[in-house]
């Protein structure tokens, strides 16, 4: 991997924000091809649509089933490619376990009675849930799962149980499954997964979970698949934020947590060896604290950011772009605008760029005059 470089903002705003609507603690937006609707994910447990004319409608209400303490809640939604009859959801249940479930989607409505549980991942604390979903072109489902959290004590060591490096648990991982049921199993294990020989369908099953695609992550709050690459914005501990980009054909990558934070050895983590390098990292300086991913701006985004990865930071609310260059590898440039309590940046209808704020706003990013 090439080295990354920080490029200062020019001081001129590259984007401006246009408010599209107000929701209850929105944390993400998803879309479907050839569908003008935006599907707004509310942390409190509801999925709502936002039409071009501003009309809103609730299509799924899980508020009675979802724990919303701290970072818990309804976390992510994804539509499988080429299938308009199903929808996939992650949320934290009443005791905080991370649920990955499927619902039938008909007539622009989700029937809660059709819920089918794929995974229930026990989670010991109310933070570092991850929960982000993404499909690849073959219909395989990727799930970003946090390390289990629990870092509230002063001087506490991150990932105390070293879950992210433990291949017998799904915490601190990117999970990859084929969500189609097979016999008594709720899903299938892709044969190309790195630890597929550990599958319970294999009589010689070992202790490594076959659902694991990659590991060594702290809190992959947002993941994104674009042009055959998986982007992972992994929230750091106390010093560094990192962005990872990996071909989906590259299985079994270890991103290093808690052996290291970003590219730097982490206390008590041992000597880092054979780890997959982040393409970019930035320090906790100037008030920055947590990376918020993130999407690749397409040609129809309506901005000059085409081909760049657009992301932000929770504490500063600043928007940034990451661009690959021949001379420096990856360069970050500030985009001028800010949004308090930024929770996501994603692709909207027609390739537009959409941002959400926990304060309630859903915004479109547009080129500044």
Task: Locate the predicted segments by residue.
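Blade-edge beta-strand/turn elements of extracellular beta-propeller
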Residues: 6-22, 54-67, 103-124, 165-219, ...
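Conserved hydrophobic/aromatic pocket- or pore-lining residues that grip, position, or stack substrates
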Residues: 133, 174, 243
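Short, small-residue-rich loop/turn micro-motifs
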Residues: 145-147, 178, 191, 261
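Acidic, glycine-rich loop-and-beta core segments that form the ion-binding/anion-interacting portion
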Residues: 194, 207-248
